[in-house]
Amino acid sequence: MIYIADSYAWIEYFIGSKKGEILKKLFLDEKNKFLTVECCLAEIKGWCLRENQDFEKLIKIIKSNSNILSIIEYDWIDAAKEKFEQRKLQKTFGLIDAMILTKQKELNCKIISCDKHFKNLSSVIFMD
């Protein structure tokens, strides 16, 4: 199975929380492949700055466990449409979440997250 791990999932994994155990267990199955959308790296860097964490160490962990998905112009355009549609249902649905959802639909994979915006969406493993 292919999974997109979002920023929230990575952070829970890094702090070793109970929620993060879900991602850790998925890493153990060699059949699973993991992706990280590059815009999530900016969110993780922001978290590192706020929490005084070593981003260089964490990005090495991310890169050793997942492939980084580059974003191109048309991805942003598609994400803007996805954000518009999601905002009809969730008023605070953001552009980064829309980008992750856009890539999930494009690649027909699953998202791993504990972000409330993904809770009731299909193809999401929600980390409770």
Q: What spans do the regions from the language model cover?
A:
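Histidine- and aromatic-rich ligand-binding microenvironments
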Residues: A5-D6, T36-V37, F93-G94, D115-K116
